Each structure stands twice: as C-alpha cells, then as structure tokens.
Amino acid sequence: YYSGDLLMHISDGVLSPIVVGIGWAIALPALAISVRRLRTDQVGTYGVVSAAFFAGSTIHVPVGPFSMHLVLSGIAGLLLGWGALTIVTVGLLLQALLIGFGGLTVLGVNISIMALPGAIMGMIGRHWIKQVSPKKRPWIGSLIGGGTILISAILLYVTLSTTNTALMPLAKLVFLGHIPIAI
C-alpha cells in the first residue's frame, strides 16, 4: 500500500470496509451539494483550478522516508467555494485512474480527507476575507491553505489509526510530515 511516492492518497485494500463505507457516506452527500451549486458561468475557472490541482500533485517534496505533494484544495475552496469539492473530486478520480494515486474503492475516503476540508475551509475563508482589509487577505489565504492541509492530515491519521493499530506509527509519521507542507 505504500509505494514510497505518496501517502496523502490512501490506496485500495488498506482500509477496512467499514471505514471505506463511512468515507462514501460522507463524500456522496457533500458531492451532491457541490454539484448542485456548480455555476455554468464558472466552467473556465473550474477547468483552470482543476488543472492546477492535478499539476500541483505532481510536485513532490521529500519528507523523511516518503514524499508529499501540493494539495491546493484550500486555495481551490477559496476560489470556488463548494464547487471546489467537485473539481478536487475530478482531480482525485483522474489521479487514481491515470497515475495510480489512491484507488476507486477508497475514493470516498480520499474525497472526505482532501476535498471536503478544502471546500469547507474555503467557504470559511471566503466569508472571512470579506471582513478584513486587502492587506490581510494574503494571510487569510495562507491560513486557509495551511489549515486545510493540517485538517486533512488529522483526518488521514484518524482514518489510518482506526483501520489498524499497526498503522498508527505510519499515521503519526504522515501527520508530522504534513506540518512542513502546511507551513
């Protein structure tokens, strides 16, 4: 399950069926909300942000015995609101199908870990950014992007740890490895 390349994406066969089911139970309603809120006048923006998300995932940063990659779901959330959940889901699906990051059965878990926090944090940031001066807006973007990574890392830790206690040391290492990415 660990290819040495990437640990933010969970691969097929790693998680218990219960955890996979919970992931889908969270992801599907959230994705339904996101799809309903898509706007046709934003199609170009969706494409650009989706391409940036996909391309960002190819930029790997070595952290100890593994490597991490840019996720960009928090920034996508700032730009697209709930629409970010859909475009990140498309990116995750393409990554699973084309380059083997993640898997199809665990796509719901990966959506719940990576896409959903980005959409939620992005919505919070979109509201917050309207309340502050333009000078402070870059700080909010940084906080939202970094906060999204930390939330995703916590969710990944919980997901791995609840599947099998033998995965706890790996889960801890993955969580700690995400801290520099968040910063």
Put a short name on every predicted segment.
Residues 140-150, 167-183:
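C-terminal transmembrane helix-loop-helix hairpin of multi-pass membrane proteins
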Residues 17-21, 43-48, 85-89, 107-112, ...:
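Hydrophobic alpha-helical transmembrane segments
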Residues 50-54, 84-96:
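Small-polar-interrupted transmembrane alpha-helices in polytopic inner-membrane proteins
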Residues 20-32, 52-56, 119-122, 145-157, ...:
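Hydrophobic core segments of alpha-helical transmembrane domains in multi-pass membrane transport
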